[in-house]
């Protein structure tokens, strides 16, 4: 019985496809697991958030231009991390899943808290950009990266500045609520919630 002729791809096309697959495998092999990456992101963002809650540009100005540039550079790092976190969420959704011991109301709160934190971080980055956009002078993060072309909108700049400040305080409240929720889970439900994001070195204390 005659067989249908096999459809063979050209050698060049096969080589390109194989190379792409190998390159993709190599790249993904060297990328950290998503949970590991988020854990690193989590503990990188937290100290920066605390820093910007406690220290304002006016606090560092008396220490000279170098101190101000360092403060500004930390802001650039913070914004970059916020945008990476938001991009990961938009691409792949929430990485965190509610544990099986959570009641229905806690499952809903779990999702709401995590989503609000991500959009809160994005909001801080956005209003930071608006501050640069409405400024009368060109602002550069860390003296390196321009914020945006300055439009010199004094009134809008004042509004953006106020929103930016209140966003930080609101974000701090969300962080406290987030931490309190997971501490409650860990102690009351005994579901080891704190071990999810805590470094392994601390697991024996939790």
Regions from the PLM with identified roles:
Residues 2-206:
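Membrane-embedded alpha-helical bundles that constitute the cytochrome b-like, heme-associated redox core
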């Amino acid at each position: 019985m005659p067989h249908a002729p096999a459809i063979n791809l050209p050698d060049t096309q096969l080589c390109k496809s194989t190379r792409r697959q190998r390159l993709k495998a190599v790249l993904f092999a060297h990328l950290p697991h998503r949970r590991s990456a988020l854990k690193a992101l989590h503990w990188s963002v937290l100290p920066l958030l605390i820093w910007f809650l406690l220290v304002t540009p006016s606090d560092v100005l008396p220490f000279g231009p170098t101190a101000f540039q360092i403060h500004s550079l930390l802001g650039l790092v913070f914004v970059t991390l916020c945008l990476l976190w938001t991009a990961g969420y938009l691409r792949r959704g929430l990485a965190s899943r509610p544990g099986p011991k959570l009641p229905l109301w806690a499952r809903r709160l779990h999702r709401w808290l995590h989503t609000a934190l991500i959009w809160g971080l994005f909001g801080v980055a956005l209003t930071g950009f608006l501050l640069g956009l409405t400024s009368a002078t060109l602002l550069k993060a860390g003296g390196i990266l321009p914020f945006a072309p300055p439009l010199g909108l004094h009134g809008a700049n004042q509004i953006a500045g106020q929103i930016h400040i209140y966003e930080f305080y609101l974000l701090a409240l969300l962080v406290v609520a987030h931490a309190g929720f997971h501490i409650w889970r860990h102690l009351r439900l005994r579901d080891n919630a704190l071990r999810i994001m805590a470094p392994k070195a601390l697991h024996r204390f939790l």
